Regions:
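GHKL-family ATPase ATP-binding module
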Residues: 1-213
Length: 213
């Protein structure tokens, strides 16, 4: 027996100049939701055209598969997606990343499934921990001298990363919710990445060397 709730949205022409839905924009957003909620199945259909479009999205791997999707046209330098997650109280954070052989940096961050294009505390926590861990690991395996230090920008060269945090009282900066301001999330993400990335590099030294090379 099928059950559930159906919600219908109809744009008010008095409020919006354009009341025609853009299928590609909606499709992109639904894909994000499916990636951010592992196992959730979303079906999107556009029945307006003579040849209707329909797609079902479900990603058991969650943000791991999101990173794979973002790197689909790139050449990763390591096959394994680095994944870390943790909780503290009512807050949860997960991070997935992979390096490719290009130079550009791509970090997509989300808070309660809301895209934060200007970053915020969750991105700050990740960047700080990534730089600290890679420098410490580089010195440990003698790829860096004691006085050498890799800059944060260099640590993120060729990086594709997705950060997703869930929290009960998200504090967004600005009306567009473009930036997350919860300082406790910076600490949570920093601690997760610091602990789990260090352990990952110890268990996968070949990946660590590829990243640092």
């Amino acid at each position: 027996e099928r059950h559930g709730t159906r919600v219908t949205f109809k744009p008010d022409p008095e409020m919006f100049e354009d009341t025609v839905y853009d299928y590609e924009i909606l499709r992109t957003r639904m894909r994000e939701e499916a990636f951010l909620n592992a196992g959730l199945q979303i079906r999107i259909a556009d029945l307006r055209a003579e040849e209707p479009q329909e797609e079902t999205m479900r990603y058991a791997g969650g943000i791991r598969e999101f990173v794979t999707y973002l790197n689909r046209s790139k050449d990763p330098i390591h096959s394994q997606i680095v994944y870390m997650a943790g909780t503290k109280g009512d807050s949860m954070a997960e991070v997935a990343f992979q390096y490719h052989d290009g130079y550009n940096e791509t970090i997509l961050s989300f808070a309660n499934n809301v895209h934060t294009p200007e970053g915020g505390m969750h991105e700050e926590g990740f960047k700080r921990a990534l730089t600290t861990v890679l420098n410490a690991y580089g010195r440990k395996i003698k790829m860096l001298k004691d006085e050498e230090k890799i800059s944060g920008e260099d640590c993120r060269e060729g990086l594709t990363c997705v950060i997703s945090v869930k929290l009960t009282e998200a504090q967004f900066e600005g009306q567009t919710k473009a930036k997350l301001g919860n300082s406790e999330i910076r600490t949570l993400v920093n601690n997760i990445v610091s602990d789990k990335l260090e352990a990952f590099l110890e268990e996968n030294p070949q990946v660590g060397r590829m990243i640092l090379d």
